Amino acid sequence: MTEKERNKTEPREHKVTNPYSGQSEMLTATEYAYYFLIKYAERTGDYNAMQKGLSKFSSLNAKAYMTLLD
C-alpha cells in the first residue's frame, strides 16, 4: 500500500486553520506531519525541505494545500 492509499484510510483528526484566511481543514496524521514540517522549514529557512514537503503535501491532499498553504 502506498502512502497516498494509506492516507485515504486514516481518520481526519487534526484541525488546522490558515492564519491569513481563517479557513480550516481536517488533516490526517500523515498530512499534519507534512504540514508541521513545511511550517518548521519555513521558519528555519530550510527551503529545500519546505519545497519537498509542499510537493508531497499537495499530492496527498490538493484541497487542503490550496486552503492552508497556497
Please report, for each region that a protein language model flagged, where it lies by residue.
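Preference for short coil/turn "hinge" residues that link or interrupt alpha-helices
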Residues: 20, 50-53
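Generic detector of short alpha-helix boundary/capping microenvironments
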Residues: 10, 49-50
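Intrinsic-disorder/low-complexity regions
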Residues: 4-6, 17, 45, 60, ...
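Charged, low-complexity interaction regions
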Residues: 42-48
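Short, compact, well-ordered microdomains
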Residues: 52-70
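N-terminal acidic leader/helix
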Residues: 1-41
